[in-house]
Amino acid sequence: MENQEKYNNLSRLVEKLKKSDDPKRKYEYILWLGKKLKEPDNVIFVEENKVKGCVSEVFVKANIKGGKLFWEGYSDALITKGLLAFLITGLNELTPNEVVKIDKKLSLIHI
């Protein structure tokens, strides 16, 4: 992956989860991230930002400033909110091209 430092936030989060073999600790960490997620502006709560097909109420919005993505999100379910916080923290301030190039080894699938 080019310019690895751009992906430090995502790498740090993935490594934190990989460190523990205890699923309960991983779950608690995701819940903790969800509790820390900043409440978004009310403008996010529109139909076009709603994640379709999810049992929980989930809203996600990306804004581009200076060529970089800045994410906002909300979920009424804490585990979903934690996963959303994981992605927002890991993907914030990357360019769209950088997001597309993320190595699959950093994905949640491998944790």
PLM segments and residue spans:
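N-terminal intrinsically disordered, cationic/polar leader segments
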Residues: 3-14, 18-57, 64-65
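Helix-adjacent hinge/juxtasegments
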Residues: 60-61, 72
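A short, structured loop/turn motif at beta-sheet edges
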Residues: 65-66, 97
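A short glycine/serine-rich beta->alpha loop
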Residues: 68-77
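Hydrophobic (often cysteine-bearing) scaffold residues that line and stabilize catalytic clefts
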Residues: 80
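Alpha-helical support elements that line or immediately flank enzyme active sites
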Residues: 83-95
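Glycine-rich phosphate/pyrophosphate-binding loops
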Residues: 93-106
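Conserved small/polar residues in nucleotide/adenosyl-binding loops
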Residues: 109-111
